């Protein structure tokens, strides 16, 4: 299985958030059975006070959460930098979450966690609602 869609687990880690200045922690991501996770989110307003970081812990509720050194990603003031992502490979603890800090009143788009390198394949995506993914290998040109 070489197709990306068959080798990842896609999780909606936090639905979009209304405008505000409060911090927004994602849901806890259980890394058991996976080597890595890519977190992706989008700030609605560019501001150099907006940033994301990743926290980890041993407890499933992350009451023991600690920041991972060097994971702070600042969105900046350039409107083209509103999407932020952090890739964590081989975390040292089982549970992770993305922690978004809003430096100005800003919305926060959906936050996704993409787990990869599952030790057992194929992983099952964890999204409520409908997830529509099609895979096309060497498709011919023509009407979609």
Could you describe each region identified by the protein language model?
Residues 1-144:
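Surface-exposed, low-hydrophobicity beta-strand/loop segments enriched in small/polar/acidic residues
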């Amino acid at each position: 299985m070489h197709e990306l869609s068959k080798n990842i687990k896609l999780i909606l880690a936090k639905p979009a958030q209304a405008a505000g200045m409060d911090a927004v922690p994602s849901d806890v991501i259980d890394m058991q059975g996976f080597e890595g996770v890519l977190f992706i989110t989008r700030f609605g307003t560019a501001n150099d006070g907006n940033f994301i970081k990743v926290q980890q812990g041993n407890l499933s509720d992350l009451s023991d959460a600690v920041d991972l050194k060097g994971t702070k990603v600042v969105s900046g003031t350039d409107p083209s930098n509103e999407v932020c992502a952090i890739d964590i490979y081989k975390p040292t603890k089982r549970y992770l979450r993305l922690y978004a800090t809003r430096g100005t009143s800003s919305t926060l788009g959906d936050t996704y966690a993409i787990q990869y390198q599952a030790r057992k394949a194929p992983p099952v995506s964890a999204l409520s609602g409908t997830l529509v993914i099609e895979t096309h290998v060497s498709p011919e040109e023509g009407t979609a």
